[in-house]
Amino acid sequence: MSKEIKKMEKKRNKALDAIDIKILNELQRNGKISNIDLSKKVGLSPTPCLERVKRLEKQGVIMGYRALLNPELLDAPLLVIVEITLVRGKPDVFEEFNAAIQALEEIQECHLVSGDFDYLLKTRVADMAEYRKLLGTTLLRLPGVNDTRTYVVMEEVKQTNFLVLK
């Protein structure tokens, strides 16, 4: 482990105490919890609890709050994972792809990965016809795209954004 990573871990560990961890875990479970209920669960009075939450937000530890939507009820039941391989030889191909993908609301996640391909994308669509349209009119036309491989998810076994904090 590099010295920089060790320093970051020490800094993070010093910045968060056991009560901060409890607050973060409760907010991960229920982002709509009231400050009064949160303070009871973590063993603080409401004012210091709220001050800690505000500090965690200001520090960027808490990045925001979101509603989890049911894609089945919102005409986006088909989850598709796409591998993207870029052409080699253009010096700015990764930067151009990164900039272009940011503008696509249809793409829920985009990860630059190591291995046999370059990017892993996650998208949700109504059906295969909609995905074929997205692939043909959008994904294949992104800067530097050389090859794609598509995986249609048959069953979502587990989906969570919960971070295990200790």
Curated annotation (Swiss-Prot):
Residues 16-91 form the HTH asnC-type domain. Signal peptide: none annotated. Residues 35-54 bind DNA. Disulfide bonds: none annotated. One of its GO terms (cellular component) is cytosol. The keyword Transcription applies. GO terms for biological process: alanine catabolic process; response to L-leucine. One of its GO terms (molecular function) is sequence-specific DNA binding. Pfam families: AsnC_trans_reg, HTH_24. Keywords: Activator, DNA-binding, Transcription, Transcription regulation. PANTHER family: LEUCINE-RESPONSIVE REGULATORY PROTEIN. Mediates a global response to leucine. Exogenous leucine affects the expression of a number of different operons; lrp mediates this effect for at least some of these operons. Homodimer. This is Leucine-responsive regulatory protein. It comes from Haemophilus influenzae (strain ATCC 51907 / DSM 11121 / KW20 / Rd).
